[in-house]
Regions:
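Hinge/lid segment of periplasmic solute-binding proteins
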Residues: 100-113
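N-terminal secretory/targeting leader peptides
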Residues: 1-94, 112-113, 117-307
Length: 307
C-alpha cells in the first residue's frame, strides 16, 4: 500500500524552502520507493489561498506537511515566543544547535500539546533585516512614522511600534503588492525574500539590522502522522534531517548571493554599527523585557547555551 504525502508551501521555485522540499521528496522516495508518493504544492497562492491558510489546511488534513514561521503559532504555543526575542542571539550555528537539541525537544512537545500538529524540523527562516522606500535607517529616529509590514504576531508589532514604526500585519502572499502600491513604506525580512519577492525593486534602502533569526517550523498533521506505518514515520524523519541540512545551507548561500544582487541593482545597503545596533536593542528593551518575563528561565538558557 502506498502512503500519499502532500507537502504544501507558499513560495516560488527559487525559495530556500521550496528547494528543501524537493530534497525531502527525493530523499524519502529514495528510502521508501513505491511505499510513498510525495505530492508537492510549492505555492498554495496559485490555488487561491493566502499563505497563512496553510496552517488550517494542514491542521484539518487537506495537506499533510507544510513549513511556516514559528511566529504565527506563538499565540497558541507560548514557548515559541523564545524564538521571537529580538537581538537575542548572534551566532547562526549556535541557533541551529539549540533547535536541534533540548530547546527543540521542548518546543516540539509544546506544539504537539497545544495544536493539531507535530513539529518535525526547524528550518532557517533567515536573518531578518529592514528595507524601505523613504530613507536610510541608522537609528530608531529614522523609523518614525514609516508604515512597516509585520507578521501576524502581536509581540512583533509591539517591538516595531517601540522603534517608531507604524506596524501593519500583512499576509506574505499580499506583501509584494503592498510594497509596489506604496501601501507600506517599509518591511522586515531575510535577504532571500527581499530579492525573490521583488521587494528590492521598490525599496532602495536596506538596513542590515539582523534583529531576528527567523525559524520556519516543518509541521505535520498529527493524526495523519501517527497513523502512518512506522517505516514511513522513520523515513519522513530521516528525509527531513537531510532536507534540513540542505535548507540551512541554502539559506546561508542566499545571504551571499542576494547581497551581491542588491549591490548589482544599486540598492543602498548599510550595516548597523555596534553602537547603532545597541541603540535599537535599547529602544525595544522595555517591550522585550515584558515578553521575556513570560518565558521560563530555563527555556531562555537553552536558547543561549545549547545542550
Amino acid at each position: 500500500m502506498t502512503t500519499q504525502i502532500r507537502f504544501g508551501g507558499y513560495q516560488g521555485a527559487a525559495s530556500v524552502h521550496t528547494r528543501a522540499i524537493a530534497v525531502f521528496a527525493r530523499a524519502l522516495e529514495d528510502r521508501l520507493g513505491d511505499a510513498v508518493a510525495v505530492e508537492v504544492t510549492a505555492n498554495v497562492g496559485q490555488l487561491g489561498h493566502k499563505a497563512a491558510d496553510l496552517l488550517q489546511l494542514v491542521e484539518r488534513g487537506a495537506f499533510d506537511l507544510c513549513y511556516f514561521s514559528s511566529s504565527y503559532l506563538a499565540g497558541r504555543v507560548p514557548a515559541l515566543g523564545v524564538l521571537d526575542l529580538p537581538f537575542a542571539i548572534d551566532d547562526r550555528g549556535r541557533h541551529h544547535a539549540a533547535l536541534d537539541g533540548a530547546l527543540g525537544t521542548r518546543l516540539e512537545a509544546g506544539v504537539a500539546e497545544a495544536t493539531g500538529y507535530r513539529a518535525l524540523a526547524f528550518w532557517d527562516n533567515g536573518i531578518r533585516h529592514l528595507s524601505n522606500r523613504a530613507r536610510p535607517i541608522h537609528t530608531p529616529a529614522d523609523c518614525l512614522g514609516l508604515r512597516l509590514r509585520t507578521q501576524h504576531n502581536a509581540f512583533h508589532q509591539a517591538v516595531f511600534r517601540a522603534l517608531g514604526f507604524e506596524p501593519v500585519a500583512i499576509d506574505p502572499s499580499e506583501l509584494p503588492a503592498a510594497v509596489e502600491s506604496g501601501r507600506i513604506d517599509a518591511q522586515e525580512n531575510p535577504l532571500t525574500n527581499l530579492v525573490n519577492f521583488g521587494i528590492y525593486e521598490h525599496h532602495p534602502h536596506v538596513t542590515l539590522s539582523a534583529h531576528l533569526f527567523g525559524v520556519a517550523l516543518v509541521l505535520v498533521n498529527r493524526e495523519r502522522h501517527d497513523a502512518w506505518p512506522e517505516a514511513v514515520r522513520a523515513g519522513v524523519r530521516a528525509a527531513l534531517a537531510e532536507a534540513t541540512a540542505a535548507q540551512r545551507a541554502f539559506a546561508r548561500e542566499d545571504d551571499v548571493t542576494c547581497l551581491a544582487r542588491l549591490a548589482q541593482a544599486g540598492n543602498q545597503v548599510l550595516e548597523l554599527t555596534a553602537p547603532e545596533r545597541a541603540a535599537f536593542a535599547a529602544a525595544i528593551a522595555p517591550v522585550a523585557d515584558v515578553e521575556r518575563a513570560k518565558l521560563p528561565s530555563d527555556l531562555l538558557q537553552l536558547l543561549r547555551t545549547p545542550e
